[in-house]
Amino acid sequence: MPPSAASEGGVAELRAAEVASYTRKAVDERPDLTIVGDAVYDAKAFRDEHPGGAHFVSLFGGRDATEAFMEYHRRAWPKARMSKFFVGSLDASEKPTQADSAYLRLCAEVNALLPKGSGGFAPPSYWLKAAALVVAAVSIEGYMLLRGKTLLLSVFLGLVFAWIGLNIQHDANHGALSRHSVINYCLGYAQDWIGGNMVLWLQEHVVMHHLHTNDVDADPDQKAHGVLRLKPTDGWMPWHALQQLYILPGEAMYAFKLLFLDALELLAWRWEGEKISPLARALFAPAVACKLGFWARFVALPLWLQPTVHTALCICATVCTGSFYLAFFFFISHNFDGVGSVGPKGSLPRSATFVQRQVETSSNVGGYWLGVLNGGLNFQIEHHLFPRLHHSYYAQIAPVVRTHIEKLGFKYRHFPTVGSNLSSMLQHMGKMGTRPGAEKGGKAE
């Protein structure tokens, strides 16, 4: 981005730049501001005019939104249009985040493939799938409340919850379902219906994971708190030698963190040590209400109606099945043999382009029909490049994306089957679980 964000914004913007200069630390302490390129903008004033919803802008209060805007809008920052929200420049001592020109060229190719006038949002046929999932979830849960829980139906309900997570809340919370932000916002609460939390999900995925994929410090999904060794900067523990054996049952047990421990993160208004922007505080009360509502609806009410061990086991079966399905497909997408990691001791520097950081830390698996079942998230590369593009288009654009990526000289990994992806993940976990230096006969780090 040019040194002055005022070049297209007029004299008033230039004068503002002369009197206002912000370091990243200063912006971090001002949740009403956000950084794009080398300029600082009034996020609080802009959020209510944001077509995609005020909550997206609010979550980036006090943060750098350069790459977030780029990947969610698939175009360059409209400096002239945004000049009325300009409040100053990024301090000369700071290095601005640059837009990725190769990525913007890829966006132009992909946009040309989309149905005219669609904007990349959900096609009409998608809503039949969404309706079927909602009807299935409500019917099964209602039936078991009235007639009693069964283990088989509880497991199937867990799968339906997972499919709702993959096919409804995921696109909604990326703003990819509809051009009407209120629809995305409301359906985003499907995450709360299945036991998660929309605000924490947005912080984890939109604010952190998507911008810092497999970063050894900044990606929350690379933090296993000693349970697993996922990245080269993690310390080694003896049990890591067995992590390829316990990773799969551990994915089912993740349900209990999601169900209970995440509430502590919500109350602290943070995720993995990263504060949620105070500008998004209006989301707090609905988030707490939804968490309490889920506990009442899915845990307390069934146990009140049928206070038995069987009921408790069926509740666990649902949440563990859903947790396993979601965690399994997510984990194999970002943890496989040869996967990139970003930052110190990683295979990629943080100065690598946006495209390279997204592509070489992700992988695809399977094809069109797995995409129908899993909300397109088996096309994880395409999803990470275009998170606000509805999943129904991923299989269509994948060949063009792959050609473009390989021309750039970057690694594009697509596993033909889930089994081959799983095997690669287990191989990677085995390598990461080996005591550093042991494979060479050396001492542990």
Swiss-Prot record:
Report the domain remarks. The cytochrome b5 heme-binding domain acts as the direct electron donor to the active site of the desaturase, and does not require an external cytochrome.
Name the residue ranges of motif: Histidine box-2. 205-210
Q: Which residues cross the membrane?
A: 126-146, 148-168, 247-267, 283-303, 312-332
| Gene it is expressed from | Plesd1
Q: Where is this motif: Histidine box-3?
A: 380-384
Q: What is this protein called?
A: Acyl-lipid (7-3)-desaturase
Cellular component terms per the entry's GO annotation: membrane
What GO biological process, any one, is recorded here? long-chain fatty acid biosynthetic process
Name the family the entry cites: Belongs to the fatty acid desaturase type 1 family.
- Residue numbers of motif Histidine box-1? 170-174
Binding, heme? 50, 73
Q: Cofactor(s) for this protein?
A: Fe(2+)
A single GO molecular-function term is: metal ion binding
Q: Do you know which Pfam families this protein is assigned to?
A: Cyt-b5 (PF00173), FA_desaturase (PF00487)
Membrane topology according to the record: Multi-pass membrane protein
Q: Where in the cell is it found?
A: Membrane
Q: Supply the alphabetized keyword list.
A: Electron transport, Fatty acid biosynthesis, Fatty acid metabolism, Heme, Iron, Lipid biosynthesis, Lipid metabolism, Membrane, Metal-binding, Oxidoreductase, Transmembrane, Transmembrane helix, Transport
Q: Which CDD domains match?
A: Delta6-FADS-like
What species does this protein belong to?
A: Diacronema lutheri
Tell me, in a sentence or two, what this protein's role is.
Answer: Fatty acid desaturase that introduces a cis double bond at the 4-position in 22-carbon polyunsaturated fatty acids that contain a Delta(7) double bond, resulting in the production of delta-4 desaturated fatty acid docosahexanoic acid (DHA). Mediates desaturation of 22:5n-3 and 22:4n-6 into 22:6n-3 and 22:5n-6 respectively.
Q: Which reaction does it catalyse?
A: a (7Z,10Z,13Z,16Z,19Z)-docosapentaenoyl-containing glycerolipid + 2 Fe(II)-[cytochrome b5] + O2 + 2 H(+) = a (4Z,7Z,10Z,13Z,16Z,19Z)-docosahexaenoyl-containing glycerolipid + 2 Fe(III)-[cytochrome b5] + 2 H2O; a (7Z,10Z,13Z,16Z)-docosatetraenoyl-containing glycerolipid + 2 Fe(II)-[cytochrome b5] + O2 + 2 H(+) = a (4Z,7Z,10Z,13Z,16Z)-docosapentaenoyl-containing glycerolipid + 2 Fe(III)-[cytochrome b5] + 2 H2O
Q: Which InterPro entries match?
A: Cyt_B5-like_heme/steroid-bd, Cyt_B5-like_heme/steroid_sf, FA_desaturase_dom, Fatty_acid_desaturase
User: What Enzyme Commission number(s) does the record list for this chain?
Assistant: 1.14.19.31
